[in-house]
Each structure stands twice: as structure tokens, then as C-alpha cells.
Amino acid sequence: MNPPDERFDIVDRDDRVVGSGLRSEIHARGLLHRAVHLWLFHEDGRILLQKRSLSKDREPGRWTSSVSGHVNSGEEYDTAMKREIPEEIGIPTATCQGLGRIKYFPACDATDQEFVWLYRATHSGPFQPDPSEVAGLEWFTPTQIDQMLVHQPGDFSSCLKMLWKQRPR
């Protein structure tokens, strides 16, 4: 779940740490901070998307990346990614084949003022999602995601829409 007393680093426009603050304060004041997203690919090319828990404080019930989360205060992006994978979808990080960074996104309104590193890996499951974090997991082809974004854009988180539009091809 997302306790309001989680502590995150506050960063400047160049993604340099300038302080730290509580999650609730950072979000309320729109301060710049950091996050990670992972797109998990099945061996057949489908992408696993996560439906955010209805108890989330930001964009509940919307489809987003396979895994996503904040970088805690004093933590590096890669460490946060490795922590979030077992927390959210219940698999050991070591079982994700080819885990690596694919693109960096600057903070903006669509990312909720988060600098984001997008990662990718391959894993075909099974998964054990944490119900306090994840309402569901589903595999989609890239074509299905493209079509859903046209016909059902409100079903997706703002961040996923932006990441998908600007994804490496």
C-alpha cells in the first residue's frame, strides 16, 4: 500500500537530490521526485499490464506498467526497481531475464512530477500480485494496447499513456 509517511528524495530539474520529504507532502506540493516503471514481456511478445488497486491514492483502477513505484529516499533507481518487482507481482527479481533500462523520461504533469526510468525484462509468469498494490494483471499485444488507448484512454494511467506514446521502437 502507499503509506503517507514514506520518505522520498526531492530532486531539482536536473534530477539531483536537493532534500527529502514525506510522500503526502511531495504529492500535495507537486515536488519533483523519482520513480521506476517496468514492462514485462512474454516470450511471445505480449506485454503484462497491471490494473492499479482501487485503494491507490493516484489513478486507482487504471492500467499501468507491469510494475511501477517510487524511489525511496537514499535509494538508486536500479535498487528501487529490484525492490518493486517482488513487492508488486510476487516474483524474484533474479527470474526476470534481461532486466535493464530502456529509456529515461523527465518529470512532467503526466508522470505526476516524477523522473522515470523505464525498464524492460522477459518473464512468462506465474505471478503472485499483492492485492493492496494490484487489482489484476493481464497480457496484451502492442496492437491491443494501441487500440485501447484510442477507444478507452481513460482506462490507462497518465504515465503509461505518455510512456507508451514516447516508447523506444
Where do the language-model regions lie?
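Acidic, metal-coordinating catalytic segment for phosphate/diphosphate chemistry
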Residues: 2-37, 43
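Nudix hydrolase/Nudix homology domain
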Residues: 22-24, 61, 73, 100-103, ...
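A glycine-rich, hydrophobic loop/mini-helix early in the fold
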Residues: 35-67
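The catalytic Nudix box helix
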Residues: 48-49, 66-99
